[in-house]
């Protein structure tokens, strides 16, 4: 057990506590309050007025799949061989010995949703993991957590521009995804009808998507790509998240009608491609005020994961603190969390 006292605590579930106490038991929070009951002789740490918060959660990154300080040797996040690879699983590439894990923990980030990049139209499944541990199997909170898909420049560039093959256009990106979804539905229907279709690893991986068990995790920057992702999800009755959502500020009213979770970022850094021309720290606040569930992301290693609190701070500052002010208002409120590499 560990008792932390005299801390300024951001509980994220109620009022802040000045000179409050927090009790840890077996690595988990057992109690928090202005005062807490603790056994006599418990190990005590005097925070001396320092800030104490829950661990930050990253909603989209590639930690463990794109290893710190490596070139091709540690780049295990994009299988740029064919544009549809739903059968790939993040947990088979995550390297817990990547030094980025320790750096993130020291920066206050304790949990991350990590997975494939956006070279492929469908890239494989993400996993939600704790960042402390030696073996990924014991770090998993949820796997599969989502199915990665990508719209816009990245799949067009990796295949159309670099390989001179489909998809060369946004039409082809959408068509490839639709075709995969239609094949999955037919495969599911045949299985349910007892027709015993030949085993297909790709379609098996897509079944949780069409069954509504996991969302499509949609990499989309440009406004039209964002709305194409929404259009396809609505056509097939799928859950989705909009990851990056760089142009979201331009279509906030339309996204508010759809009530789709948005993961905004990475907003630190330069505008390294055309899709990022409208990158802004104000996007998260605009979408939050429109009534959407918003998460600020690093897309690590685009922004190193330990700088997630910094990215969240910039987002709050650009919004004039409005996001934080909404947190303690009574009644139902949109949620905002600290929390996909553009790759």
Positions of PLM-derived features:
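His/Asp/Glu-enriched, well-ordered alpha-helical/loop segment
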Residues: 68-69, 75-80, 85, 215, ...
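Metal-coordinating catalytic core of metallo-dependent amide/deamination hydrolases
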Residues: 128-231, 235, 268, 301
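Alpha-helical scaffold segments that flank or form the walls of functional sites
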Residues: 72-122, 166-187, 193
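Divalent metal-dependent hydrolysis catalytic cores, especially in the metallo-beta-lactamase
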Residues: 83-89, 97-132, 141-154, 213-216, ...
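Divalent metal-coordination and catalytic microenvironments
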Residues: 7, 22, 27, 49, ...
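Histidine-rich, glycine-flanked metal-binding segment
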Residues: 9, 13-53
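Active-site gating loops and adjacent loop-to-helix segments of metal-dependent hydrolytic enzymes
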Residues: 67-94, 135, 148-162, 210, ...
């Amino acid at each position: 057990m560990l008792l932390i006292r005299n801390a300024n605590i951001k509980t994220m579930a109620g009022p802040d506590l000045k000179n409050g106490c927090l009790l840890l038991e077996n690595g988990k929070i057992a109690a928090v309050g202005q005062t807490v009951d603790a056994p006599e002789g418990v190990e005590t740490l005097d925070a001396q007025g320092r800030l104490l918060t829950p661990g930050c959660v990253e909603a989209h990154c590639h930690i463990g799949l794109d290893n710190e300080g490596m070139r091709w040797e540690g780049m295990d996040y994009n299988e740029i061989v064919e544009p549809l690879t739903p059968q790939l699983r993040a947990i088979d590439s995550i390297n817990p010995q990547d030094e980025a894990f320790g750096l993130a923990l020291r920066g206050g980030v304790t949990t991350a949703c990590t997975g494939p990049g956006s070279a492929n139209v469908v890239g494989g499944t993400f996993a939600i993991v704790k960042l402390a541990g030696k073996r990924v199997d014991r770090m998993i909170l949820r796997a599969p957590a989502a199915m990665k898909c990508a719209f816009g420049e990245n799949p067009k560039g990796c295949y159309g521009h670099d390989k001179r093959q489909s998809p060369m256009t946004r039409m082809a990106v959408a068509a490839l995804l639709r075709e995969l979804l239609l094949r999955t539905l037919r495969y599911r229907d045949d299985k349910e009808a007892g027709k015993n279709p030949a085993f297909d690893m790709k379609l098996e991986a897509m079944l949780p998507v069409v069954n509504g068990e996991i969302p499509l995790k949609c990499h989309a920057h440009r406004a039209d790509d964002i709305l194409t992702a929404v259009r396809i999800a609505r056509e097939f009755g799928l859950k989705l998240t909009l990851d990056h959502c760089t142009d979201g500020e331009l279509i906030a009213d339309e996204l508010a009608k759809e009530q789709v979770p948005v993961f905004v970022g990475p907003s630190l850094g330069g505008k390294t491609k055309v899709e990022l021309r409208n990158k802004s720290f104000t996007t998260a606040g605009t979408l939050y005020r429109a009534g959407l569930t918003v998460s600020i992301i690093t897309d690590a290693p685009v922004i190193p994961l330990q700088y997630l609190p910094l990215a969240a701070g910039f987002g709050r500052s650009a919004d004039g603190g409005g996001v934080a002010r909404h947190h303690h208002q009574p009644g139902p409120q949109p949620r905002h969390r600290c929390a996909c590499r553009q790759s």
